[in-house]
């Protein structure tokens, strides 16, 4: 029983329950807070999608020898295949083809080797026989001699350098653009090697970064590494 003073509005408890129940149903049907959160979430997603559309594709540039393959003049283990030229035997690094297939729809893929043009083309008949993975091939004649060392000038790729990475086992390759470099352990034929699996994970982390140089500088600090 609700006590009332003079002039107060007297209510019935059962009517109060009905009124509160109706009010609660109204709130649940029209959850303005949730709608506002959903609207904000949708707007954020649209902005995110738009920013991703505006970004050029990430360009991934691979070195060849000791990064994707191992070559030797004599056959050292069963996985090696003789090149068509007959000059050497080549084995493809574990997970190489899988990596190329995974990132192909997401990235521009290029090859930048310090090997001769004829050698690189010969090796690519094993890695990419149908020409489906690599958008551009650069070889020794595109390298830059810096104090007697072959450096790779990524400006020659024609790609946006803020959205370009070079994966290479040789540190001197990064001399001209150190903050675009991703060092990888050289491969000499180990069957249990998983370096390219690690590269896949890193590439995926960089896919939507506006400036990969900032990330790679913090991660590797290649500017301070002596070659």
Residue ranges and their predicted role:
Residues 52-73, 169:
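Asp-based phosphoryl-transfer active-site loop
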Residues 51-56, 103-106, 158:
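Loop/turn segments within WD40 beta-propeller blades
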Residues 1-62:
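Non-catalytic pre-domain segments flanking phosphatase-related domains
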Residues 96-125, 138-140:
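Substrate-recognition element of Asp-dependent hydrolases with the DxDx(T/V) motif
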Residues 69-93:
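Metal-dependent phosphoesterase signature
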